[in-house]
Amino acid sequence: MFASKNFHNQSAFCCDKMSQFKCPSSLIIAGPSQCGKTTFTRQLLQQADSLFERSIREILYCYGQWQECFKDIAPRVAFVEGIPEDIPSLFPPNCRPGILILDDLMRNCSDDERILDLFTNVSHHCDVTCIYLTQNLFPPGKFS
């Protein structure tokens, strides 16, 4: 997978069958504030049909702070402030495979055992690709 310019001179992901993401997968996108984590994720979601080996049926974006750029992907993506209580129930069998994004929630995630469970059990059993956006790859916390 690599970035290229499309017809409108916008960045686009190019991939072949060998470089598509498996479903489910776990992705961590880490970097300092304003480095493009959300922009990268937005582009990934806009091109999800070609970047994942199977067609994604449900996308849930959990955020800590609303950003105007979310409107660009809003028609296909459901947005939730914070971390929902019962994540598996949000991805019933008819909505799989799915993608769950946790953006700017490291304060909420570091001491939440559900996040550990999400990346291990829930991701596999509910066929959900988890994408975690963070500024600090190793925040202090009980479960990190």
What are these regions (language model features)?
Residues 27-49, 54-57, 64-68, 78-144:
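Conserved P-loop NTPase motor cores
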Residues 6-11, 59, 134-136:
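Short, functional N-terminal and low-complexity linear motifs
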Residues 1-18, 66:
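N-terminal pre-Walker A segment at the start of P-loop NTPase domains
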Residues 3-7, 77-82:
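Intrinsically disordered, low-complexity eukaryotic regions enriched in glycine, serine
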Residues 24:
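Short coil/loop residues immediately preceding or within conserved phosphate-binding loops
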